[in-house]
Amino acid sequence: MTNIRKTHPLAKIINNSFIDLPTPSNISAWWNFGSLLGICLILQILTGLFLAMHYTSDTATAFSSVTHICRDVNYGWVIRYMHANGASMFFICLFLHVGRGLYYGSYTYSETWNIGIILLFTVMATAFMGYVLPWGQMSFWGATVITNLLSAIPYIGTSLVEWIWGGFSVDKATLTRFFAFHFILPFIILALAAIHLLFLHETGSNNPSGIPSDSDKIPFHPYYTIKDILGALFLALVLMMLVLFSPDLLGDPDNYTPANPLNTPPHIKPEWYFLFAYAILRSIPNKLGGVLALVLSILVLAIIPLLHTSKQRGMMFRPLSQCLFWLLVADLLTLTWIGGQPVEHPFITIGQLASILYFAILLIFMPVASIVENNLLKW
């Protein structure tokens, strides 16, 4: 009798994706983040669903409904903080996942990479809209500042912003539509993630050496299922430490003040995971230029496969590129720090230098270093 998991139409898909999937035998813990992102997404959808049962998307009651969730709903505070800090864990995993792709040359799988970029944009949009929902001071002013950036688009900008707002300012209509979008987008992300996986399984996984591993594959289960469970347990440990010991560590105290259109907070800043892009935006004195730089800070990832000049795939055996990669990581950490600082000397200059360095490393230094390494191999 044939095994049902290999013959049943639905079980067969699951089997070929998670059980009998031929996987390179040498992939490291850096390959855990795909499954961790899947776990984060499911966690966010579930906690978000329970929050949506008690939340009201009305400017008059949104803030108090979140307070009600934390005070009166059974374990509401756990659900709320798991959702808020779950978003932070999601972005940590995302950044590490993208970093892994850059380091090991996974971007040569262009379909998988491009779907990944679309996923990154979608997750960022979802997180931004979710941040608006508690209707605190930073929610309101964050929404006002970020949506207002669209007014930099020539000719249609102002009309576009008012169309998104549903009026002449961020108000009830804006909050209601942001809630609707915030609810639907995770399911779109789920569909995109399935497509991401579909394209990945067309080519098979990359591995640390960057050398094709068709001659040395092992089944995904039990080897990598157990490895992924270990990663998931570590993720759960970090998340629950955050939720139970310092739930507001990554949040903004201003968001515990109800939204007030008449009172601007001293420093308007987004959640920590957007600070690097926010710093790039602020480092350009021109509004349209800043918006373009902001979009390009993520969209630059789409150009990277075209700039791959090395004869090797990953950076495992390329010391010059490795140095540049870790310089890029340090630069992004610097940008994240600058994004949270007020716009004054010396932060302005540091931000501008870090922004220039970010684009220079990705677009100039890395391709040049690869050419140098190719020539060094000839010696």
Curated annotation (Swiss-Prot):
Heme b b566 binds at H97, H196. GO terms for biological process: mitochondrial electron transport, ubiquinol to cytochrome c. The chain crosses the membrane at residues 33-53, 77-98, 113-133, 178-198, 226-246, 288-308, 320-340, 347-367. It is a multi-pass membrane protein. Binds 2 heme b groups non-covalently. Its cofactor is heme b. A ubiquinone binds at H201. InterPro entries: Cyt_b/b6_C (IPR005798), Cyt_b/b6_C_sf (IPR036150), Cyt_b/b6_N (IPR005797), Cytb/b6-like_sf (IPR027387), Cytochrome_b (IPR030689), Cytochrome_b_C_euk/bac (IPR048260), Cytochrome_b_N_euk/bac (IPR048259), Di-haem_cyt_TM (IPR016174). It comes from the Eukaryota. Heme 1 (or BL or b562) is low-potential and absorbs at about 562 nm, and heme 2 (or BH or b566) is high-potential and absorbs at about 566 nm. The cytochrome bc1 complex contains 11 subunits: 3 respiratory subunits (MT-CYB, CYC1 and UQCRFS1), 2 core proteins (UQCRC1 and UQCRC2) and 6 low-molecular weight proteins (UQCRH/QCR6, UQCRB/QCR7, UQCRQ/QCR8, UQCR10/QCR9, UQCR11/QCR10 and a cleavage product of UQCRFS1). This cytochrome bc1 complex then forms a dimer. This is Cytochrome b. It comes from Gulo gulo. The lineage of its organism: Eukaryota, Metazoa, Chordata, Craniata, Vertebrata.
